[in-house]
Design a protein with these regions (language model features):
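Extracellular/oxidizing-compartment recognition motifs
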Residues: 1-180
Length: 180
């Protein structure tokens, strides 16, 4: 769900507002879940080629529906934007029982870009941690220890990608970051 109010000023200095309403078209997204710290779940099979290009035919899409207004008050997000400021390559890659372990040689925060030629429906998990426990990434030192989240430790600092299986696929999480 979303509501959009885009205000802009044209070259002549006149202000304009574009607001979303029931005339807008909508379709399901390949982004199934996102959380600033928990990670993303992205299904590449649901991608719609060209959806964000001029002239895309969205006539098969549904019209947007008015949803109940959320409770609470709107607040401006004060978090700094997540920008690419550096790209790192791993200093080592080790095969483990559960997959591969990538060591970047430093403690940092960011996201990993996945480039893969996977099989249709193949599910790939990218787990992040700042140190190892029993040879696997451990998140005990970087998750928010709250009682009601204890059951969700499995999902902390993890991105999940499901492959389309049609050649090289590239996935970079857009709405999260991790310590590793």
């Amino acid at each position: 769900q979303m509501a959009l109010c885009l205000t802009y000023t044209d070259k002549s200095g006149e202000a304009h507002c574009i607001e979303s309403d029931e005339t807008w078209r909508t379709e399901s997204s390949p982004l199934l879940f996102d959380d600033y710290r928990f990670g993303e779940i992205y299904d590449g099979r649901l991608e719609i080629p060209g959806w964000n290009t001029i002239g895309f035919d969205d006539s098969a899409w549904k019209f947007a529906e008015r949803a109940p207004q959320p409770r609470g008050e709107k607040r401006l997000c004060t978090a700094e934007p997540i920008d690419i400021v550096n790209e790192l390559k791993p200093i080592s890659v080790t095969k483990t029982e559960k997959g591969y372990l990538y060591d970047f040689g430093i403690n940092t925060a960011g996201v990993c870009r996945l480039c893969v030629r996977g099989e249709l429906d193949q599910r790939i998990e990218l787990r992040h941690g700042e140190h190892l426990k029993d040879g696997l990434p451990d998140v005990e030192n970087i998750w928010f220890k709250r009682e009601h989240w204890a059951r969700d430790l499995e999902y902390v600092h993890k991105d999940v990608y499901t492959c389309r299986g049609d050649g090289e696929e590239v996935y970079t999480p857009a709405f999260t970051y991790h310590g590793f």
